[in-house]
């Protein structure tokens, strides 16, 4: 893919965000791009290839926001970008003369998405790639929900390589936990715990202790100081998280 891009646009500056998205996991890809893209300069072209439907009739799309461009399959991988942006143009990429000849049905990242991204970065304007569409695939991110007056239920969105359990609970969902001195609560993950402390950093936790911390992704994380909360709690992606406040 990089070779294709550089062959078309030798001056391209290619930055790898990640190659650690879980295989076939469109939501994991959506989470990765949504957390990274806004830190890049205006005009950046983001090539997002998490494409378990490669070779099927799913559409290649070009999404343009106020500051960024995204080239991706139309499978929902840009759903969290749609959630963050207010001015969006989405186009079905149909201009096949920008694709590589003799296209494979198993590697559209190389044969379709990379040459489109390279030509876009080189200066070809978005309308040249295809017409706008409004029926693009978009899924709703899972949101925490109240179970009763004192209990909030969420899930684990992701386990990072350190074993931190990243929940879908944002500060506005649990404002009482945003203070590191918060008391009168307990958190369970998959029924295990309880976790009764919010720390201001990973290093503030005691060795072997599982605790909550507000992470850089903007969500509540369950972590362990120099350890794996995932292993300590036997929990993974999709596990239920319960936050119970004292009555």
Give the location of each predicted region.
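N-terminal glycine-rich anion-binding loop in soluble enzyme alpha/beta folds
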Residues: 1-21
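A conserved acidic, glycine/proline-rich C-terminal tail/linker
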Residues: 166-234
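Anionic-ligand-binding alpha/beta catalytic cores of soluble enzymes and soluble regulatory domains
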Residues: 100-180
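Alpha-helical scaffold segments in soluble metabolic enzymes
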Residues: 3-4, 32-35, 80, 112-119
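Structural motif
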Residues: 12-15, 44-47, 60-62, 68-71, ...
């Amino acid at each position: 893919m990089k070779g294709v891009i550089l062959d078309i646009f030798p001056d391209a500056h290619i930055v790898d965000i990640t190659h650690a998205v879980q295989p076939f996991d469109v939501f994991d890809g959506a989470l990765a791009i949504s957390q990274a893209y806004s830190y890049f300069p205006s005009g950046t072209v983001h090539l997002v290839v998490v494409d378990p439907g490669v070779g099927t009739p799913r559409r290649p799309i070009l999404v343009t926001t106020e500051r960024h461009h995204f080239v991706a399959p139309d499978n929902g991988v840009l759903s969290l970008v749609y959630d963050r942006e207010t001015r969006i143009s989405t186009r079905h990429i149909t201009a096949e003369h920008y694709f590589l000849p003799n296209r494979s049905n198993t590697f559209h990242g190389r044969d379709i998405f990379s040459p489109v991204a390279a030509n876009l970065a080189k200066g070809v304007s978005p309308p040249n790639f295809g017409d706008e569409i409004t029926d693009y695939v978009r899924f709703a991110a899972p949101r925490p929900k109240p179970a009763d007056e004192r209990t909030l239920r969420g899930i684990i969105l992701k386990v990072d390589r350190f074993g931190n359990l990243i929940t879908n609970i944002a500060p506005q969902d649990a404002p009482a936990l945003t203070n590191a001195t918060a008391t009168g609560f307990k958190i369970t993950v998959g029924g295990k715990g309880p976790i009764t402390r919010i720390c201001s950093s990973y290093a503030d936790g005691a060795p072997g202790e599982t605790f909550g911390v507000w992470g850089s992704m903007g969500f509540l994380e369950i972590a362990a100081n120099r350890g794996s909360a995932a292993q300590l709690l036997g929990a993974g992606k999709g596990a239920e998280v319960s936050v119970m406040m004292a009555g």
